[in-house]
Amino acid sequence: TGMLMLDRVLYTSTHYPANYGFIPRTYAEDGDPLDVLVLCSEAIYSLALVKCYPIGVISMLDNGAIDDKIIAIPFNDPTYNSYKDISELPRHIFDEMSHFFRVYKQLEGKETAIDEIKDSKAAVKIVEKCIDRYIDYFCKGKPQPEIKAHEEQPAEV
C-alpha cells in the first residue's frame, strides 16, 4: 500500500543500537522479512533503501524460534565501510547489540537469547536463502509454512 505499519513499540527503556529495518523481498524463518541492523554514521529515515553489504549475523532464539539479525554496512559510509566482518567491530559496538537483543523483550514477558554469532559468509548465505524463500512463497505460489512462534501471546503481569 506504500504505507508504514508500526511493528512494535519497545517495552523497555532501551533503544535500538543501530538503524533497524528489513531486507526487502526476503522471507525469514519467523514469517517476516529478514531483519537487518545497519551500522551507519547517520540516522536513516523510514522507507529509505540503503545499499549495504552484510558483515555478519546474530542468530537469536525468540520464544524458542530462530530469528536472524543481519548486521550490515552501507557501501558509502566512510566511518564504517572499512569493516568487512563482524569480528572486526570494536568490542563495545558488538556488546551493545548483544545486550540489546538479550533484554529488549523482557518486559513483554518474552524470552530472547543469542544462539550464535556468524561471519559475513554465513550472513550472505542466510540472505540468499531468505530471497529464495520469498520467491518460492510470493512469486511461485508455494504454500507458506505455519508459523506459530510469531503469534502474539498476552504477557502475564
Which residues fall in each region the model found?
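Hydrophobic N-terminal alpha-helices or hydrophobic patches in metabolic proteins across all domains
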Residues: T1-V157
